[in-house]
């Protein structure tokens, strides 16, 4: 796990200019050619997975503050509790998604829960409209977690999304035996061209299945 490697071998990485590809290359010799390539952006995707026996929350807190720009150091996205949360909606739109939580007793069964509750488990059937609608749902929930606001997010909201604050809130929630179910890596769809994403929402609002917006 990257967090444990940083903790053990490069504990003060946030005080230096860490080349994440070079660091990974030193471990993953099998994929040396991949790390030798040039990239315009680097995305790191973690699962929160509070039930995992190898927890490094302090290091991850530092990582999420350090890896905050995809075209420079790299950008870290954390899914709560794991990747499958991107499709943990019972319908599209799903206005109840804002309030969905996962409780401690269900952490180990999350994949099964998603499989039983998702509106569609077959990602091969997802189209552009589906992915945009999902990204908007998750962004709306992240805004709710961060600011306790229940409204449609704007591009300015996206620009001021504080992943470190969201992680801290989720970490505190964990002490109360729950976390909010939300996916952040799906926001890569927005991160690539934020203005284009929000322009599409504005111009073609009724084409998407969006929460918390009155559609004509």
What are these regions (language model features)?
Residues 2-15, 21-216:
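C-terminal accessory helical subdomains adjacent to catalytic cores in phosphodiester-
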